[in-house]
């Protein structure tokens, strides 16, 4: 497949300044010289993302940005989209809204079935990401650690593509059969992703990786007479194309002959496993593995896939025992560039994924729920990740020992902010009066319309403090680990918008969150040495106030610990360097006017594809709906109607009625537009 060689075109009203030009030059030079590992030490607000965008544009090579969580991935994706509107900027995170992996608890003899609800929008974005890597050179994929988990084999995936070309000789039956192999379904009523409809000699196909473009194939006898793109919602033509490639519905589709070969290998492994269980006198396990595996084989024979097909990925991808699974890295071009954001968090995360997954699967294998080959359906081990990773830039305000070691201690410094903003002033105050002291500081900040972050050591302390502040008339919210990604983004958005003034949390107010309105960070019990009060944690937390002109951090402690001292020293070093730069260049620190963007609605679709979890229907009044256009309203209406039908089909009539009421409200709004 020939790849388009379009260059990266960076759009920005700003030119690199401060430490950015030297950082861009050093990183680019290092990459051109073939350095495998480089570290960018960039403080909060120094424009690390802009620096990386410049490096990508200068190198003109495809890139993958790894973020430690979905919130930061969404933020990075939005920023990169703004920098490169003409290029392919994609988003690749876990597509599960809810995921319960299959597991067995021997102590209570409880088997937990796999249960999941898949977010269709994120699934489409994942397919779009791999398509861009395969088709285009000007691709940036922003991913979470989901990138190290097994994906379908890239060779099998490419083998399954359906290439359509103007004038090609192919009959209608063959096209429909190939679409069925790609797991597309025929649906002449509801035209949605991964479906096709047939009207005479016209086939309309809604590609799995697309959200707003469909393909119309017009045949004359056995010849493709016309290929045209159209808007699936309005039916408006978007122009003709000479050729088009239809990608499979999922990354896990496999050619028929490979499935048949895999089935033979699975049967062979099943024979060996049964012999082992009989020899060990484990008759229940022998019966269990036989029953489960034979059912899966039957399904694969008839349909080409089965529930939990990923557990047979070793055979389907033709890999040997213990070999690394195919992942997003296999789809990435060989000369790609890897940028690991907030590397001090992301790198340890990559290392920890394999072990947790392995422990759960070993129990399933031991008790006859899975064949031993299921152990090869796993995330990459850390050493495999290291072997697969291309040239890498680690980005962090507090790089970890691993990154420093890999870069041979040679760190690219980006401490000076183009805005002239200084690191927060740090004060240490006694613990005894910390709560009352924080309250008085909050009143000062609220009076000038600024926000406050407070970080505590325990959940109990955070809850009690939130209640206490609430009783004293403070508009306060508590951010805790039970809050899902989407709600977390909403809370941070509401804080910036001034819906409330104080946010209390434990370990949730650290890496990478952009909140220029926050002028005070209060760290309670700062003198309790440990993970939450380590040098890196303190620097990261203090950094949340570094985007404000009046930034200040108060550390409450009765003594200055080693970690506190290091954090204070490093913050002062950065402050002095910035001050010197400001004096030399006559810069007056400027407040950041970073506008509060519209909430990213990535993955906020109403309907999960499957899963036993009940889908919550939000009760919204008609004036909650403020879409940008009539087209968006119609799209939402279509989604709700589909959701209502699904609930009715599952005999969930109360939920169907709630959605029906929602549809009524939306139709009322539609009449006014």
From Swiss-Prot:
A motif (Beta-hairpin) lies at residues 95-118. The keyword DNA repair applies. Keywords: ATP-binding, Cytoplasm, DNA damage, DNA excision, DNA repair, Excision nuclease, Helicase, Hydrolase, Nucleotide-binding, SOS response. Residues 607-632 are annotated as: Disordered. ATP binds at residues 42-49. Its main location: cytoplasm. One of its GO terms (molecular function) is ATP hydrolysis activity. It holds the Pfam family UvrB_inter. One of its GO terms (cellular component) is excinuclease repair complex. Residues 634-669 form the UVR domain. The keyword Cytoplasm applies. GO terms for biological process: nucleotide-excision repair; SOS response. Residues 29-188 form the Helicase ATP-binding domain. Residues 434-600 form the Helicase C-terminal domain. It is found in: Cytoplasm. It comes from the Bacteria. Forms a heterotetramer with UvrA during the search for lesions. Interacts with UvrC in an incision complex. Belongs to the UvrB family. The UvrABC repair system catalyzes the recognition and processing of DNA lesions. A damage recognition complex composed of 2 UvrA and 2 UvrB subunits scans DNA for abnormalities. Upon binding of the UvrA(2)B(2) complex to a putative damaged site, the DNA wraps around one UvrB monomer. DNA wrap is dependent on ATP binding by UvrB and probably causes local melting of the DNA helix, facilitating insertion of UvrB beta-hairpin between the DNA strands. Then UvrB probes one DNA strand for the presence of a lesion. This is UvrABC system protein B. The lineage of its organism: Bacteria, Pseudomonadati, Pseudomonadota, Gammaproteobacteria, Pasteurellales.
């Amino acid at each position: 497949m020939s790849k388009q060689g379009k260059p990266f075109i960076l759009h920005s009203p700003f030119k690199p300044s401060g430490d950015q030009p030297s950082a861009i030059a050093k990183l680019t030079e290092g990459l051109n010289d073939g350095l495998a590992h480089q570290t960018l030490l960039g403080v909060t607000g120094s424009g690390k993302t802009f620096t990386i965008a410049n490096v990508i544009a200068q190198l003109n090579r495809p890139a993958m940005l790894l973020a430690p969580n979905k919130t930061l991935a969404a933020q990075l994706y939005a920023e990169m989209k703004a920098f490169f509107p003409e290029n392919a900027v994609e988003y690749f995170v876990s597509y599960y809204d809810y995921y319960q992996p299959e597991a067995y608890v021997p102590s209570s003899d409880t088997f937990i079935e796999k249960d999941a609800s898949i977010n269709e929008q994120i699934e489409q974005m994942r397919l779009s990401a791999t398509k861009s890597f395969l088709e285009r050179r000007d691709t940036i994929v922003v991913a979470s650690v989901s990138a190290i988990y097994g994906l379908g084999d890239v060779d099998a995936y490419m083998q399954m593509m359906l290439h359509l070309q103007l004038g090609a000789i192919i009959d209608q039956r063959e096209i429909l059969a190939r679409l069925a192999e790609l797991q597309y379904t025929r649906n002449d009523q509801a035209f949605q992703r991964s479906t096709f409809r047939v009207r005479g000699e016209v086939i309309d196909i809604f590609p799995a990786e697309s959200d707003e473009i469909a393909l119309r194939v017009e045949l004359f006898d056995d010849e493709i007479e016309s290929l045209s793109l159209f808007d699936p919602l309005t039916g408006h033509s978007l122009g003709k194309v000479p050729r088009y490639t239809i990608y499979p519905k999922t990354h896990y589709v496999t050619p028929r002959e490979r499935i048949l070969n895999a089935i033979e290998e699975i049967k062979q492994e099943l024979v060996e496993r049964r012999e082992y269980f009989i020899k060990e006198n484990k008759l229940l396990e022998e019966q269990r593995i036989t029953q489960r595996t034979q059912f899966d084989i039957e399904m694969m024979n008839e349909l080409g896939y089965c529930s939990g097909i990923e557990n047979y990925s070793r055979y389907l991808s033709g890999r040997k025992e213990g070999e690394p699974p195919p992942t997003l890295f296999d789809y990435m071009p060989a000369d790609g560039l890897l940028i690991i954001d907030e590397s001090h968090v992301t790198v340890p995360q990559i290392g920890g994924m394999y072990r947790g997954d392995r422990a759960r699967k070993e129990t399933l294998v031991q008790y006859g729920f899975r064949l031993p080959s299921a152990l090869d359906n796993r995330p990459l081990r850390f050493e495999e990740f290291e072997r697969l990773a291309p040239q890498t830039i680690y980005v962090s305000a507090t790089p970890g020992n691993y990154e420093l070691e890999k870069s041979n201690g040679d760190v690219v410094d980006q401490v000076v902010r183009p805005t002239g903003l200084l690191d927060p002033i740090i004060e240490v105050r006694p613990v005894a009066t910390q709560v009352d002291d924080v309250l008085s500081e909050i009143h000062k900040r609220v009076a000038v319309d600024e926000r406050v972050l407070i970080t505590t050591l325990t959940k109990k302390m955070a809850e009690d403090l939130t209640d206490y502040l609430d009783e004293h008339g403070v508009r306060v919210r508590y951010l805790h680990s039970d809050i899902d990604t989407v709600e977390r983004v909403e809370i941070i958005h509401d804080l910036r918008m001034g819906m409330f003034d104080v946010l209390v949390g434990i370990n949730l107010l650290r890496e990478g969150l952009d909140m220029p309105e926050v002028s005070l960070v209060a760290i309670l019990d700062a003198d309790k040495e440990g993970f939450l009060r380590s040098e890196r944690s303190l620097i990261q937390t203090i950094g949340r106030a570094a985007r404000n002109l009046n930034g200040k951090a108060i550390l409450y402690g009765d003594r200055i610990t080693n970690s506190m001292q290091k954090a204070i020293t490093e913050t002062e070093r950065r402050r002095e360097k910035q001050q010197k730069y400001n004096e030399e260049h006559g810069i007056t620190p400027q407040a950041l006017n970073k506008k509060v963007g519209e909430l990213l609605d990535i993955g906020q679709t109403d309907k999960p594809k499957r899963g036993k979890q009940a889908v919550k229907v939000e009760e919204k009044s008609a004036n909650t709906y403020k879409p940008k256009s009539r087209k968006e309203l119609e799209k939402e209406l279509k989604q709700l109607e589909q959701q209502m039908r699904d609930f009715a089909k599952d005999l969930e009539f109360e939920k169907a009625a709630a959605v029906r009421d929602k549809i009524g409200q939306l139709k009322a709004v539609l009449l006014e537009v």
